[in-house]
């Protein structure tokens, strides 16, 4: 008996049948004597439908007058958050019709307070003084994920995948014993099984590895949810909501490194196509120039990822290459053009057709030779590397998008990820 | 220059094209120097879509266990209110893209406070301390209609058509000069033009008449919106949102009787198929018996309409016949069965296939002979009258539903409603 948070993504609540199936999974935990808070996403496809409505109107500017009436992220949030509002109410009804007391909670009702960065807000605080007693009183709390309330009393949203972060933050605020993330896959894999059919489900993975994988494009968990869980040492279990009754569904436990137990150098290969490469040509060679670029990007709310400074062979001037999320490219380019004088560069080049491929593993800390294996595997297939970035536990390369599948397969093979290196460990 | 409230129903915001058209109508008023609050309904079809999701889950009770987990109106409200949330955000974006400052306001953000009768809540108070200054500051307020917040901090809704009431109440709270209700018809007609093609648009109609027509099934305005407007003497203009550019769109002005100016005895013929007839057989003949029936209905939140007490020819016992809204019939029957001993009756009969047909007119106050004309017209067509109810300005009869069109045409003709009795009056 304890307090648990369960989170169900869009495909898990895609229609009434799925919502009923979710209510059965929740009922099982309630019957086991747990206090349960459930975090739900919008029904699959609903967020896209709403976003497409917003985008169509957003584009209604007279020619040449970009964003004529200003930012619309506040209204985007109010519109898109309605998707989770619907699902939370529906699941609350489904729970009641099983005879289980339940009520929905919207972000502003909890309240889950965020900063003012509409459409990519960050959680500032979750009030537990209303929802906590309601749980203790035997009510299932069905929480609309992805949403909160900003200081001006408007609805805010946490960005795509934000429901994971809602769930983890709620679990921390409610001092829950664990957070189970139900999704449409049965755990975290060594790589995308659509590209490498031999990819293997991991029984456990360290927070740090999951963080890198999530940052690198493995879309199972939102990056910030993993950061949060790591900071508070909250174990997350990733498992499928589609398990057949009676069938084992251990999922993957994302937990502290000491608990992972499996010995391996590389845990997984990730890739992200949502990348764009920007190169600033012939930069003025003054101190603080990179800081100015980063400030311009940060002011525009654009996250800069891989950064490389180099010397152009043709004119011996300094160039700066970095990557941003592909959907931020236009904003980034506009911000850089506006700051061209301030930063001091001659021209901008950009490329949307790039993919970041990465190998990740806690074991890289104490093993050498990973980079060499990686670069050799890519070179053997004639794949050219544009940019390299490394951290303690990962190596990322930026390559031409058309080599994506080839690169992922080559690396999965080079690090023998299809083979189990340790006996499977059962999740608790 | 003044302050106006404009309200757009579901068909007026049915898709992005219509929302853009609405933004043009709003822009016109802004350009004329007005402060404008716009109240919007959900996109046409959206409320039905959401209600059907709710209904499907609501029906998930084990056989024999009706409403096993209790009332779900609170969750219904939270789910269905999302429709207006989306439209308000979309129209705010459309306004901004015309270069006009605008923001959406949800019921809880204003706040528009209601009682706790979820799914048919009544407005208790509209706070104008936030929205008023925002308007005065030059922002268009795009208000999600139909919704408010109840004392427990949950979303409440005002019942079908509630956006009209939102608009009128907001106009009163904001001390607006007028309230324009844009809809898919170009005004109030003498009767339903689908049944009587010769039906005529009225230039003006008295609050009292509109109130009867609205109560009687003319679906252009919600009853409570008319009551409110009458109590505060706020003129409502009903006009179409589909007018062709440059074409006259006077609509119908709903206003104080003295301002109607058109002389006529009967203004319109209304009908409502959303009726069900209940008869309690062999009632115990004790004082307060009807009061007990009314209390049972009121406790179940069911509105009782026409009431007739009679003596059964067969056994000389007292019977009580009354009508309720068809969608309340099951609730009403359940409540009556539960109170059978308390009220004291032998059996219940009910009939769903009944229609209420009514003639309405301020002039009936000072003219006799209306009832005679009405009953003769129906008798000539062999239409049997089940129940009769009258007020100062209307006569209603309950008939078998299959005679609905025949009865409406007969009455429209009997009162010469296709002829203009006074020269048309132009709305201000």
Regions found by a protein language model. Give the residues of each.
Chain A
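A conserved regulatory-domain signal marking ACT and ACT-like small-molecule sensing domains
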Residues: 246-428
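Terminal amphipathic helices with adjacent charged low-complexity linkers/tails
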Residues: 40-51, 238-259, 322
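Acidic/polar loop patches that form or flank catalytic/metal-binding clefts of enzymes
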Residues: 222, 233-240
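Conserved dinucleotide-binding and phosphotransfer motif residues
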Residues: 32, 98, 232, 300, ...
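Structural motif
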Residues: 2-4, 34-38, 77-78, 101-103, ...
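Active-site-proximal loop/turn and secondary-structure-junction residues that shape catalytic pockets
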Residues: 10, 44-45, 147-148, 242, ...
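Nucleotide/pyrophosphate-binding catalytic subdomain
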Residues: 1-226, 399-400, 415, 419, ...
């Amino acid at each position: 008996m304890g307090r648990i948070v369960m989170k169900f993504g869009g495909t898990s609540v895609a229609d009434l049948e799925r919502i009923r199936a979710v209510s059965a999974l929740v009922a099982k935990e309630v019957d086991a004597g747990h206090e349960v808070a459930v975090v739900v996403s919008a029904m699959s496809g609903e967020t896209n439908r709403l976003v497409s409505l917003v985008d169509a109107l957003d584009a209604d500017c007279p020619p040449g007058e970009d964003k004529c009436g200003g930012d619309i992220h506040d209204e985007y949030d109010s519109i898109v958050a309605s998707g989770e509002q619907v699902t939370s109410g529906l699941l609350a009804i489904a729970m009641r019709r099983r005879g289980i007391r339940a009520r929905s909670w919207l972000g502003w009702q909890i309240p889950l307070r965020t900063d003012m960065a509409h459409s990519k807000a960050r959680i500032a605080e979750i009030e537990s003084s209303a929802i906590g007693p309601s749980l203790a009183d035997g009510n299932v709390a069905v929480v609309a994920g992805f949403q909160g309330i900003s200081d001006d009393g408007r609805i805010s949203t946490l960005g795509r995948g934000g429901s994971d972060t809602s769930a983890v933050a709620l679990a921390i605020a409610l001092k829950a014993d664990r957070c189970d993330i139900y999704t449409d896959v049965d755990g975290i894999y060594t790589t995308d099984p659509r590209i490498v059919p031999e990819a293997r489900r991991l029984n456990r993975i360290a927070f740090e590895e999951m963080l890198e994988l999530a940052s690198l494009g493995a879309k199972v968990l939102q990056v910030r949810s993993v950061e949060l869980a790591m900071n508070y040492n909250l174990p997350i279990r990733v498992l499928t909501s589609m398990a057949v009754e009676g069938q084992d569904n251990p999922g993957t436990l994302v937990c502290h490194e000491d608990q992972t137990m499996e010995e391996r150098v590389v845990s997984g290969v990730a890739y992200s196509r949502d990348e764009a490469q920007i190169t600033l040509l012939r930069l003025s060679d003054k101190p603080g120039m990179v800081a100015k670029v980063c400030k311009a990007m940060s002011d525009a709310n654009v996250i800069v990822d891989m950064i490389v400074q180099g010397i152009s062979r043709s004119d011996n001037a300094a160039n700066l290459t970095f990557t941003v999320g592909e959907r931020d490219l236009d904003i980034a380019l506009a911000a850089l053009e506006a700051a061209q004088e301030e930063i001091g560069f001659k021209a901008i080049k950009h490329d949307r057709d790039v993919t970041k491929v990465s190998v990740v593993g806690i074991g890289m800390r104490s093993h050498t030779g990973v980079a060499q294996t990686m670069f050799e595997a890519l070179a053997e297939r004639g794949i050219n590397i544009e940019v390299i970035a490394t951290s303690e536990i990962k190596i990322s390369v930026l390559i031409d998008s058309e080599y994506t599948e080839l690169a992922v397969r080559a690396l999965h093979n080079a690090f023998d990820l299809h083979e189990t290196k340790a006996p499977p460990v059962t999740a608790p």
